[in-house]
């Protein structure tokens, strides 16, 4: 009898403890702040070489215009609207967990980052933490930018400081409650020195370039809202927008469904396919040719970088995955 009474008391306590534990856990998840570190006190020196490197990163490799500049997606490749570089605005991807806005990153002191220190800008780029300490939604690819070398992130900041200031108030993103809690673990402060990668490192240098450019992020399909790591670079991630729906391509070395049969010349020509449209004369397109792939930016990748990226992609695991880029529309061959 005593054993039975003790067992009943034990299970009763357990039943009381479980909801208390769940409530405490939920409260912790709600009130906890994302990991962050104080911004560095660095002051980036403005040199012509650094600004030029930053321009290459901003406009080409990292394609910052893709989110932070107004673009015309009724035209092939979504060319940037003149005079709109860095002004920010609402992201037009469907299926996002709320209203997501890309901030104004011009030097405007009231609506942009003109009053931010260089250290605060670097922290936002690599750590995903804004000037006031709030977390940036990780549609901003700072999980990849945390690998930017110190000299590259300083170059990026230097170029941003040269942009014309645009007065354009952009509201803060409004994310669903559950998702806002789940993504709090994404920011990881960069607290170490990150040296430059040897530009003559072949596929190792290519891995650095592909990582900060976010190739894997777009070219890996998702499963239940998370990247399917078993299908890295295999394409098939769905991007739905007001202008059309497009699926990312398979860029693994699979010979039938990826780029396994491509040589470097074909890869280079594909990346530079927008060069034929001079003076921003990009044709009007419908959903059958809509693309989010930043060909307009990548046409300016230098041969050395492009070849390194190609070597890296060719070294990945080949995955058979046939992708129809524009569902419901006939495929347009290269």
What residue spans do the PLM features occupy?
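Electrostatic cytochrome c docking/interface patches
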Residues: 36-59, 183-211, 257-259
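Electron-transfer interface patches adjacent to heme c in soluble/periplasmic c-type cytochromes
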Residues: 85-120, 143-153, 232-278, 295-306
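A cross-kingdom feature marking solvent-exposed beta-strand/loop segments within repeated
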Residues: 132-148, 277-300, 321-322
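Detector for the c-type heme attachment site
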Residues: 67-73, 126, 141, 161-162, ...
């Amino acid at each position: 009898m005593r054993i039975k009474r003790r067992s009943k008391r034990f299970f009763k306590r357990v039943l009381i403890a479980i909801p208390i534990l769940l409530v405490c856990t939920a409260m912790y998840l709600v009130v906890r702040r994302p990991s962050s570190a104080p911004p560095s006190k660095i002051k980036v020196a403005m040199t012509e070489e650094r600004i030029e490197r930053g321009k290459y990163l901003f406009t080409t490799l990292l394609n910052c215009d893709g989110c932070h500049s107004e673009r015309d997606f009724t035209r092939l490749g979504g060319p940037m609207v003149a005079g709109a570089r860095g002004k920010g605005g609402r992201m037009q991807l469907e299926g996002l967990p709320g209203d997501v806005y890309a901030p104004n990153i011009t030097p405007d002191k009231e609506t942009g980052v003109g009053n931010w220190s260089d250290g605060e800008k670097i922290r936002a780029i690599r750590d995903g933490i804004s000037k006031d300490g709030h977390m940036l939604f990780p549609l901003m690819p700072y999980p990849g930018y945390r690998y930017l070398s110190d000299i590259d992130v300083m170059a990026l900041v230097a170029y941003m400081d040269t942009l014309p200031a645009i007065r354009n108030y952009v509201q803060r993103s409004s994310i669903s409650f559950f998702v806002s809690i789940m993504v709090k673990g994404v920011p990881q402060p960069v607290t170490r020195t990150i040296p430059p990668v040897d530009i003559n490192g072949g596929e190792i240098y290519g891995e650095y370039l592909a990582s900060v450019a976010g190739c894997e992020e777009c070219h890996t399909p998702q499963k239940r809202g998370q990247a399917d790591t078993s299908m890295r670079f295999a394409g098939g991630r769905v991007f739905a927008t007001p202008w059309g729906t497009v699926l990312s391509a398979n860029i693994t070395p699979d010979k039938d469904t990826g780029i396994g049969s491509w040589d470097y010349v074909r890869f280079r020509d594909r990346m530079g396919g927008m060069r034929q449209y001079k003076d921003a004369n990009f044709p009007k397109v419908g959903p059958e040719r809509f693309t989010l792939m930043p060909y307009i930016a990548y046409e300016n990748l230098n041969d050395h970088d492009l070849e390194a990226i190609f070597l890296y992609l060719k070294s990945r695991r080949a995955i058979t995955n046939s992708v129809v880029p524009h569902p419901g529309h006939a495929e347009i061959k290269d």
